[in-house]
C-alpha cells in the first residue's frame, strides 16, 4: 500500500498499491512512492540483507530517502513519518478485524490471531496488542499458507434459491422440497467431476431476517430455526424481538467432500534456549530512540525454544516482528506463538 498526503495534508495509506512491479522503493525496480514495506524497512522491522531468506537484498538507503521526502511533506521527522505509516496501516487492519469480531458479537480476547502472508507477521503483534487479543500464531511457511490451504482444502460448493416467504406462511414441505432440489443438483455436479456421493456431506442453512430488514443471518435448518435466528440476532447485534415477523429469504445447501488429512511436521519440545538461531544483531528504531534486537533464522528454531522481544524472525516467505513486551515460543508444530510477556 502506498503512503502519501491526501488533499488535506493528512497521511493516507492505501488503497493505492505499488504492486509487485514496480513495488516498494526498496525493491529497486523504479518505485518512487513510499509503501508500508519501505516504512518497515526504515524502522528496522525488516532486514535488508535477509529478505526472501537472504536470496535478495533490499535498498535501505533508497527507502530512507523516500521516507525523508514523505516526512518533509508532512512536517514530521523521518521516524515519525515511518511510524505514522504503520499506525495508519494498522488502524485499517484493526477496523477489518472489528467488523468480523466485535460487530458480530465476538470478543477478540477470546481468540488467537492467526497471521499469514508475507507481511502478516510484521504487524500481528501490534494488532493483537491494540485489540486485546491474547496471543498470535504464525504458522510455518506463513507466506504461502493460502497456497497450502488451497491444496489441502475440502471440496466445497454452495447452492442457493431465493424464497422470500414470511415464516408464519411457510409450509415445511416447501422448505424441504427447495432444499432437496438443491441437494440433487449438488450430488449431480459432484458425480460429474468423478466424485463418490458417499464422500459428500450436505449442510442445510436458511437466510432469515426480520421483515423490513435489509440484511439476513444464516442459521442451520431445523424445526427451531426461528428461535435460532432470534438467538443469533441477539449475539450479533445485541437485541432480538420474538414478537416481530420473520421471513426466510434464501435456502442454501453447502456440499462438502473431505480430503484426506495431511500430517504436517511435528517434533517433541526441546529446551528454551534459542541462541543457536540468532544470526545477527538488528537495530530497530522507536520514537524514543534505537532499540537493539536479535535477528533469528526461523529454520534454526526448534520446538520449545523461546525468547523475549525485541527481535525479528526471518524466513524465506515472511518476517515476524516480536516487539518489546512480547515473548515468542515455538510449539510442537513449529508455529511461532507470540504472547505479551517479559520483554527486554
Tell where the protein language model's regions lie, with residue ranges.
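C-terminal, non-catalytic interaction/recognition modules in large multi-subunit enzymes and RNPs
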Residues: 2-13, 18-22, 27, 34-35, ...
Amino acid at each position: 500500500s502506498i503512503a502519501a498526503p491526501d488533499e488535506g495534508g493528512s497521511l493516507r495509506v492505501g488503497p493505492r498499491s505499488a504492486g509487485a512491479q514496480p513495488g516498494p522503493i526498496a525493491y529497486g525496480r523504479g518505485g518512487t512512492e513510499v509503501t508500508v514495506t519501505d516504512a518497515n524497512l526504515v524502522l528496522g522491522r525488516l532486514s535488508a540483507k535477509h529478505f526472501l531468506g537472504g536470496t535478495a537484498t533490499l535498498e535501505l538507503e533508497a527507502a530512507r530517502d523516500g521516507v525523508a521526502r514523505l516526512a518533509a511533506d508532512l512536517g514530521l521527522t523521518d521516524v515519525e513519518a515511518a511510524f505514522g505509516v504503520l499506525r495508519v496501516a494498522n488502524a485499517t487492519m484493526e477496523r477489518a478485524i472489528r467488523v468480523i469480531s466485535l460487530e458480530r458479537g465476538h470478543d477478540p480476547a477470546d481468540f488467537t490471531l492467526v497471521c499469514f502472508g508475507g507481511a502478516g507477521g510484521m504487524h500481528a503483534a501490534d494488532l493483537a496488542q491494540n485489540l486485546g487479543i491474547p496471543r498470535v500464531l504464525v504458522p510455518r511457511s506463513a507466506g504461502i499458507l493460502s497456497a497450502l490451504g488451497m491444496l489441502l482444502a475440502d471440496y466445497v460448493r454452495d447452492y442457493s434459491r431465493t424464497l422470500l416467504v414470511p415464516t408464519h406462511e411457510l409450509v415445511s414441505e416447501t422448505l424441504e422440497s427447495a432444499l432437496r432440489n438443491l441437494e440433487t443438483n449438488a450430488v449431480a455436479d459432484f458425480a460429474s467431476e468423478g466424485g463418490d456421493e458417499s464422500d459428500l456431506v450436505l449442510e442445510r442453512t436458511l437466510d432469515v431476517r426480520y421483515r423490513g430488514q435489509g440484511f439476513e443471518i444464516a442459521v442451520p435448518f431445523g424445526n427451531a430455526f426461528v428461535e435460532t435466528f432470534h438467538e443469533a440476532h441477539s449475539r450479533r447485534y445485541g437485541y432480538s424481538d420474538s414478537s416481530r415477523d420473520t421471513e426466510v429469504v434464501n435456502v442454501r445447501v453447502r456440499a462438502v467432500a473431505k480430503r484426506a488429512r495431511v500430517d504436517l511436521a511435528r517434533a517433541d519440545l526441546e529446551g528454551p534456549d534459542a541462541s543457536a538461531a540468532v544470526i545477527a544483531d538488528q537495530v530497530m528504531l522507536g520514537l524514543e530512540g534505537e532499540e537493539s534486537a536479535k535477528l533469528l533464522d526461523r529454520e534454526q528454531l526448534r520446538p520449545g525454544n523461546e525468547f523475549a522481544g525485541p527481535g525479528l524472525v526471518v524466513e524465506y516467505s515472511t518476517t515476524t516482528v516480536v516487539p518489546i513486551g512480547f515473548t515468542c515460543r515455538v510449539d510442537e508444530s513449529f508455529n511461532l506463538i507470540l504472547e505479551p510477556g517479559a520483554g527486554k
